[in-house]
Amino acid sequence: PDEHLSVSRTSLFTRTDTRVRYRGSLADLKGYTIGVVAGFSYGTLFDNADYLKKEEVQNTRRLISMVVSGRLPLGIENEAVIRGVAGSLGVAGSIRFLNPPVHSRKLYAGFSRRLELRKLAEEFSRSLKDFKNSGEYRDILRKYDVSHSELTRQREKTSGS
């Protein structure tokens, strides 16, 4: 389909009271230790940044707790995952995300390339686009603390990719 489901953003996060100078260049982060979940990829640019000090942790819950406790100044992970896990841990108000994201990409539903499914994919894309313009969609985003303007900005930024 032409219409993407959402945008996946891999972002840096820190405590709300921690000052970090980051303007979108990974070189800005040379003096910091960045928590990463072992075995995960955070985009080629970050993964290949050997000049950064990265500390592996077992899982996302541990990553968040180490950042919130001050044991790590920064963490990196999928933004939606961090929001969800931090919310379940009751610490969502203790962290903030740094902009811009380190990596982002559109997520699509996959359909077989068989000719008879092409029409279904086109209908799905049209219906998804209509749904994204609905109040129901905005209500869902609000429920899960995702701003519509944030998604619109991401859609505009990634429309060329």
Residue ranges with predicted function:
Residues 13, 35-36, 75, 110:
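Short, well-ordered beta-strand segments
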Residues 1-29, 39-40, 99-102:
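Acidic, polar ligand-binding/catalytic clefts
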Residues 36, 52-66, 99:
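Short beta-strand-to-loop elements that line the ligand-binding cleft
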Residues 6-11, 87-125, 147-160:
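Periplasmic-binding protein-like
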Residues 28, 48, 61-81, 88-89:
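Short helices/loops that flank or line small-molecule/ion binding pockets
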Residues 10, 26, 43, 61-64, ...:
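Extracytoplasmic/secreted envelope proteins and their assembly/folding machinery
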Residues 17-20, 32-33, 110-147:
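Extended ligand-binding regions for polar small-molecule ligands
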Residues 41-54, 94, 128-161:
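Ligand-binding clefts/hinges and TM-proximal coupling segments of bilobed small-molecule sensing domains
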